[in-house]
Amino acid sequence: MDVRPYLPADRDACLAVFDSNAPDFFKSHERRDFEGFLDRGAVPYFVMEHDGAIIGCGGYFVTEQKAVARLVWGMVRRDWRRQGLGRFLLLFRLRQITKAGGVEMVHLDTSPDSASFFQSQGFKLARVAKDGYAPGLDRVEMTMKLTVCP
């Protein structure tokens, strides 16, 4: 399993990963948001590859408060889920955030179906916004205090 920085040539493969998770984890209107995010390329974003095929992607950014990072657009292709790859990608991003230095708290938002995964990795529920993504799809906001062991 390799993880590397996203390149514009990865766009279609990342959109295919997104599409494999719709409509269960993403609603159709979110695809435009994801396309715009990929096209802007404004934050650290990574792709996970297996034998040259992109099977996952995810990124983060450090907020203006500097001590807070936010995980964004993390996903694993549907046919590769339930194999520990979501955890692998999450830990990779947390290591990148740690390397950036100065970050004390990590925030994310996710769907209710994925919230238990993040809770199992140490994230705490901050709040639930009913219909926050779309009618019938709540937005779950979660946080984790980032601790670095010497």
Each model region followed by its residue ranges:
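Short, high-confidence coil segments that cap the C-terminus of an alpha-helix
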Residues: 43, 102-105
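Conserved catalytic-core motifs of GNAT/GCN5-like acyltransferases
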Residues: 105-109, 119, 124-141
